[in-house]
Design a protein with these regions (language model features):
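Short aromatic-glycine motifs in intrinsically disordered, low-complexity regions
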Residues: 48-55, 89-94, 244
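Right-handed parallel beta-helix
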Residues: 98-105, 122-133, 145-159, 169-190, ...
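Extracellular "leader-to-stem" segments immediately downstream of a signal peptide or signal-anchor
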Residues: 1-79, 287-325
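Structural detector of coil-to-beta-strand junctions
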Residues: 115, 138-140, 162, 185-187, ...
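Extracellular beta-strand-rich solenoid/capping regions of secreted or surface-exposed proteins
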Residues: 71-78, 86-103, 109-128, 132-145, ...
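Extracellular beta-rich repeat passengers
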Residues: 223-225, 230-234, 238-325
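Residue-level detector of conserved, well-ordered beta-strand and adjacent loop positions
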Residues: 65, 103, 151, 164, ...
Length: 325
């Protein structure tokens, strides 16, 4: 498993460097985030490419506990590391500007009522937050957003999707999240008619996620090639695991499927079929992964190490979700 050590002072140094030029309000103190030494300091996969994904590094670190302060810093043109200590209640989809790290404090950081909308932005990190009860999506990445890292969150009970990525967004890593109590989990590409914007984009890595009893879309892919789905733990997914449609190319590698009748799918709804290469997956009381044109799935363009499929359940259940970084 790829694991790198995070220097405890990395984000603190960034905050100190900018403290003289950006003075937070009294309700938002400058502090160093408390991050355990075993957390990854940078994303694995696509979000490590295209210049990398650092979020608000280089800006001030602020702590917020209410929606007003959260919105003020999340929409600022300046870089910020925003520590969420408490419940942020939103009334709808809340815009997040470029160059932001939004990270929960311990297990106390929560977003409810609404979700986060990353629209035409670059370089955003969302970590260690509990999302529940969104009136639409919990996290929506769209309109050409790039270099996004969604890591170590707990997501459930959204009205639509939990993590939807669409409209030409690119260079995204979704890692170490726990998804539960949800039908539609992770959409990648929103429409069969959006080939012109999506082809050659929507490159996403899904790694070390815990798909815990969710029904479908883990992910549901259109057009993108290659999408890399590896070292995830699927359990009790009554619809399907990963789906490839509209000539997408998806590598489904070294995942652990438990009680999943249909680990992979190449046909959903009215979409044309996609291509899947499935290798090294560990199956417990699960069906055989369906593949199609595995040679059409492009090579993954970044270095990585995949853990053996049989070890993934223990790794993911010990490390995914909030309070684990």
């Amino acid at each position: 498993v790829i694991k790198t050590s995070l220097s405890a002072g990395t984000l603190a140094l960034a905050a100190l460097a900018a403290a003289g030029s950006a003075l937070p309000s009294a309700s938002a103190q400058i502090r160093a985030p408390m991050v355990q030494a075993n957390a990854e300091s940078a994303p694995v996969g696509y979000a490590s490419m295209n210049g990398g994904t650092t979020g608000g590094a280089g800006g001030a670190t602020v702590t917020v506990g209410n929606a007003a302060d959260f919105v003020r810093y999340a929409t600022s043109a300046s870089p910020y590391v925003i520590r969420v200590n408490g419940t942020i209640t939103l009334s709808g989809m809340q815009d997040v500007a470029s160059n932001k790290t939004i990270i929960g404090v311990g297990t106390s950081g929560r977003v409810t009522g609404g979700g986060l909308d990353l629209d035409s932005v670059r370089n955003v990190v969302i970590r260690n937050l509990t999302f529940t009860g969104a009136g639409d999506d919990a996290i929506n990445v769209q309109d050409g957003s790039t270099n996004i890292w969604i890591d170590h969150n707990d997501l459930s009970n959204a009205r639509d999707g939990l993590i939807d990525i669409k409209r030409g967004s690119d260079f995204v890593t979704v890692s170490w999240n726990r998804l539960h109590h949800q039908d539609k989990s992770m959409l990648l590409g929103h429409s069969d008619g959006n080939a012109s914007q999506d082809t050659g984009k929507l490159r996403v890595t899904y790694v070390h996620n815990w798909l815990d009893g969710t029904t479908q879309r883990h992910p549901r892919v259109r057009f993108a090639n290659p999408v890399h789905v590896f070292n995830n733990y699927y359990v009790n997914n009554s619809g399907y695991g990963a789906a490839s449609t509209e000539n997408a190319g998806v590598l489904v590698e070294n995942n652990y499927f438990e009680n999943v009748e249909e680990p992979t799918s190449i046909q959903e709804g009215s979409s044309d079929p996609g291509n899947i290469r499935a290798v090294g997956n560990h199956l417990v009381n699960s069906g055989t992964p369906v593949t199609r044109n595995p040679g059409a799935v492009k090579a993954v363009p970044y270095p990585y190490t995949a853990e053996a499929g049989g070890a993934v359940k223990a790794t993911v259940t010990a490390g995914a979700g909030v309070g684990r970084i």
